[in-house]
Amino acid sequence: MLRNGVQRLYSNIARTDNFKLSSLANGLKVATSNTPGHFSALGLYIDAGSRFEGRNLKGCTHILDRLAFKSTEHVEGRAMAETLELLGGNYQCTSSRENLMYQASVFNQDVGKMLQLMSETVRFPKITEQELQEQKLSAEYEIDEVWMKPELVLPELLHTAAYSGETLGSPLICPRELIPSISKYYLLDYRNKFYTPENTVAAFVGVPHEKALELTEKYLGDWQSTHPPITKKVAQYTGGESCIPPAPVFGNLPELFHIQIGFEGLPIDHPDIYALATLQTLLGGGGSFSAGGPGKGMYSRLYTHVLNQYYFVENCVAFNHSYSDSGIFGISLSCIPQAAPQAVEVIAQQMYNTFANKDLRLTEDEVSRAKNQLKSSLLMNLESKLVELEDMGRQVLMHGRKIPVNEMISKIEDLKPDDISRVAEMIFTGNVNNAGNGKGRATVVMQGDRGSFGDVENVLKAYGLGNSSSSKNDSPKKKGWF
């Protein structure tokens, strides 16, 4: 019965995929999905981000996304804020390593007005000295907050170590020591290089394609580039190690040590990306305490083999960061300080078991369960217009097209346990072959007493993890962003 339900849902998806894509004369792409409803979602997606920041532009992405929807050459800051409130206040600008996203959700009749404000903030920001200083102070506070939360700071350290502080290793959050040097001059230089129509996608959900084209032509059709195209540096994975002091303890919370071990993963457009996503779901994981009650992810490997077996583990979860030409895949673990010497071996065992332990090989049942969980997560997320919008905008920015949902579901359905094991072995033995020709070394970041974690490299080597042929003499240079 459930199987029939899945098949019917699959058929409905195929019939309702009404994606359309056009380009304006200036190179700007317009993507639409005319999903019916009383609300529409729209966004502008810029092919920029922290990975493209040169030495003089470090931190500009972070500050620029905080300066969104402020005063412009044609709209004062107060008028901008008041108009946005009247339109519902559901707007945001977020930055990542590979793009900046200006997004909003409004009533259908307000799409034109919101696009006008978006085009103002993207094309004509005033960037007053007062606004800049306010956002610098806000950034300092934000940095302090990040350093108080291991789940936020460790992924940053992971990227910095994995790529030696360059390209994908450039800090997503502006380093504190660079905040004073961020000026309007550098921000405008960054915008001049990356904010161009050829680097931009205008995406709409719930708006007819012809109307979207008309509005985009009206507000963005006369936008012209003033800078030649930028040659973008390929991300080169190097691997590495980093350790920071223990996090402060508040109230009655326990003191914990944290460790993340990762290897170079796959680019987002790699044919095996669906197998890797399924592997992440299969490993799963979570915390020893679940605020929503028991049951979520109980059958994932990191729950059954780690959280249910080792009392000293507070949190254990698989992570996957995928980008246009590289990625990082691994496992994160938090434990009591006394158990830090066992942490590396616990992680190494779980990685090894996915491809080399014949007694714990991946079964048809657990792979099927992971595939169903991945499909349901994908489909439920896409029920939100804002999620559908972001998915469409980022796909067009990266691939030049939107991959149909039924195509993604079909590729997940076709996976076999051997596919998952093959990809796991490729990742965990350091044999990924990406454009940057990265080394197959592990990336290890820790928060706690470094000596307590022991000889991480030898433990990983004992389990056959990582490519140990890399010489110790070509250790990556340390960058002081953190």
Swiss-Prot record:
Statement: the UniProt record of this protein carries the keyword Cytoplasm: no
UniProt-annotated location(s): Mitochondrion matrix
GO biological process, one term: proteolysis
Pfam families: Peptidase_M16, Peptidase_M16_C
One Gene Ontology cellular component: mitochondrial processing peptidase complex
GO molecular function: endopeptidase activator activity; metal ion binding; metalloendopeptidase activity
Transit peptide, from-to: 1-13
Taxonomy, superkingdom: Eukaryota
Record key words, sorted: Mitochondrion, Transit peptide
Subunit structure: Heterodimer of MAS2 (alpha) and MAS1 (beta) subunits, forming the mitochondrial processing protease (MPP) in which MAS2 is involved in substrate recognition and binding and MAS1 is the catalytic subunit.
Role played: Substrate recognition and binding subunit of the essential mitochondrial processing protease (MPP), which cleaves the mitochondrial sequence off newly imported precursors proteins.
Name by which UniProt lists this protein: Mitochondrial-processing peptidase subunit alpha
Gene source species: Saccharomyces cerevisiae (strain ATCC 204508 / S288c) (Baker's yeast)
